[in-house]
């Protein structure tokens, strides 16, 4: 099995934010939130990262210039599954595992990413889903 590829979903508008700025570009501690996600993935040892862009793609591309990521374009926002499908041409090079994460999850930790990848590689899985157990899940999973 080859190295893990990460797909970062960053095509959405972030309608609830009531702004023209793509949600992944909102600042968190002085940086666009997507940088925290990319930092965690790269710290976990992931070398190939595909960022799916759509809404105001040029702003996201500009923000991420120099980060060494590849881009896939989701011209029409038709959901998460469709966004991942847009990566197919970049993923057909092998049978390596693919980790799909949201670009608006700045709290993701490299240790969690590493553990998920290790669990996947140790088992015989077609799919492995990382989840979170919360004492109070109110507001999650809209």
Residue ranges and their predicted role:
Residues 20-36:
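Short catalytic helix/loop segments, enriched in acidic residues and glycine
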């Amino acid at each position: 099995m080859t190295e893990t590829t990460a797909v970062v979903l960053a095509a959405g508008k972030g309608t609830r934010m009531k702004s023209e700025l793509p949600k992944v570009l909102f600042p968190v501690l002085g940086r666009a939130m997507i940088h925290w996600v990319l930092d965690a993935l790269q710290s976990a040892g992931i070398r190939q990262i595909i960022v799916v862009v759509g809404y105001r793609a040029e702003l996201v591309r500009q923000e991420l210039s120099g980060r060494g990521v590849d881009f896939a374009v989701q011209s029409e926002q038709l959901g998460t599954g469709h966004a991942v499908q847009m990566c197919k041409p970049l993923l057909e090079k092998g049978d390596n595992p693919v980790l799909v994460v949201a670009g608006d999850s700045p709290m993701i930790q490299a240790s969690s990413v590493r553990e998920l990848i290790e669990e996947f590689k140790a088992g015989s899985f077609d799919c492995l889903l990382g989840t979170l157990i919360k004492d109070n899940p109110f507001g999650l999973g809209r």
